[in-house]
């Protein structure tokens, strides 16, 4: 059997049928629809399109469950900043595997975190949004992920 190749694609460039397939899957997962027929009707998608894409399109966070993710942060140098950042990661259920922090220069520091998402209660997008909202975080991005 041929090994599957996956790509990370921004939602806004996906065809409507794929976006709506993700919406149908979300409706079913959250029990907001009683059946596939009900969910596709709510999402305005044909059942055939749903069945065509249902096993081919996934939210990013479902692909990184039980994975290791490396995050990069550019932070203002403030007392307690790293502690607050780590608290959000811990509250999400992630396990911190490694931390690397540069010495602050000109009031800024870089932090690289490798985390295990096996116990993550939230999806990665929720965690990333919480981290971005911290007033001392200038930049946060996913550098990579792997098993």
From Swiss-Prot:
Residue stretches making up the ACT domain: 70-145
Position of the signal peptide: none
SUPFAM superfamilies: ACT-like (SSF55021)
Domain of life from the UniProt record: Bacteria
Pfam families per record: ACT (PF01842)
Family (UniProt): Belongs to the UPF0735 family.
Protein name per UniProt: UPF0735 ACT domain-containing protein BPUM_2431
The species this protein was found in: Bacillus pumilus (strain SAFR-032)
